[in-house]
A protein has these predicted regions:
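Enzyme catalytic cores with a strong preference for nitrogen-chemistry domains
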Residues: 1-265, 277, 281-290
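PAZ/PAZ-like end-binding module
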Residues: 273
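Conserved G/P- and acidic residue-centered "switch" motifs that form tight phosphate/ATP-binding loops
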Residues: 269
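Conserved beta-strand positions in the Rossmann-like core of class I SAM-dependent methyltransferases
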Residues: 294
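ATP-dependent adenylate-handling ligase core
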Residues: 288-290, 298-301
Length: 301
């Protein structure tokens, strides 16, 4: 809690090497069911930008979008708990303003079914904003009231879960993950829709020149050598999806051209075998006799 004039704000503090870099106020205050934050706090939408004296340091508290740039050049933003559950989370604007990492400080309680929904929500938000989304929730012992906290900690990269905490642990946990910021930047450059959405988005940027990782870098994340080939049950689903996409594409072409025959070069390899299976399935779905499939063997290949 940070007092500003006669108001009280629910804030996150960004601190690096003993220096308070800035404060970010919570935007969306839940006031339903077991939540009653509006009894105490004021939304960031209802304040004006102001300098705040706290812990012996003066920092700027903005009423708009605030980003932080590290000494390594990474841009990150912060939102708090309920913010990500809103229809238009602050992280949308943070990402469009340039944030590559989003940090969420949360006190979201546990309810039946809420955990799986939360994971889906964070994955979608990370993918939609093309960010690394780092979520840290309250854990065991952080409440004496009528709620339970599970100690959820997640690190997502463009929708993919990289690291997570042990749920309901009675011990303190540190969740560590490595995100590929260059990859996120590349994905954004390739996505014209993301660039088009950035028009008119501005933000205050607080710059810290101290390097975040002065020591030598050590790669600890797992890099899949076969990123396009899943393992386990998902492999069957992926192959079935590919097969049906091919069938749908061929069916559309045959229907459009009113073709009654297809001609295949059969070499005996995997490619021509798959092509033959796709043709057979397509003809069956279109109720066309398989006699219209003409295979030409090519033993020289």
């Amino acid at each position: 809690p940070v007092p500003v004039g006669g108001l009280l704000l629910n804030c996150a503090a960004v601190i690096h090497k003993g220096s308070l870099l800035g404060l970010v106020a919570k935007t969306y205050l839940p006031n339903y069911k077991e939540f009653y934050e509006k009894r105490w706090f004021t939304s960031a939408k209802d304040i004006s930008s102001v300098d705040v004296r706290i812990a012996g340091q003066t920092v700027h508290l903005s009423s708009g979008t605030t980003l932080f740039r590290t000494g390594d050049g990474a841009l990150f933003g912060v939102e708090i708990c309920e913010d990500v559950w809103a229809v238009t989370p602050p992280s949308n604007r943070l990402a469009l303003a340039g944030a590559e990492l989003i940090f969420n400080l949360s006190a979201s309680n546990e309810l039946i079914g809420k955990h799986s929904y939360l994971m889906s929500l964070l994955s979608q938000q990370s993918a939609r904003t093309m960010t690394a989304y780092i979520y840290s929730g309250c854990g065991y012992g952080e409440s004496t009231q009528d709620v339970v906290y599970g100690g959820n900690g997640f690190i997502y990269e463009n929708g993919v879960l990289l690291s997570r905490s042990e749920r309901f642990s009675f011990k303190q946990q540190l969740v560590i993950g490595q995100v590929d910021i260059e990859r996120l930047r590349t994905e954004r450059r390739l996505n014209s829709t993301f660039a088009a959405s950035q028009c008119g988005i501005i933000a205050d940027v607080i710059i810290d020149t101290k390097p975040v990782t002065p020591r030598d870098f050590e790669l600890i994340r797992s890099v899949d050598p076969h990123p396009f080939v899943p393992t386990g049950p998902e492999l069957d689903n992926r192959c079935n999806e590919i097969f049906n996409i091919q069938v749908a594409g061929l069916a559309k072409r045959i229907t459009h051209t009113h073709a009654e025959n297809v001609v295949l070069g059969i070499s005996g390899g995997l490619d021509s075998t798959l092509a033959l299976l796709v043709c057979s399935k397509t003809f069956d779905k279109l109720n066309i006799p398989r006699s219209g499939i003409i295979g030409i063997t090519m033993p020289g290949f």
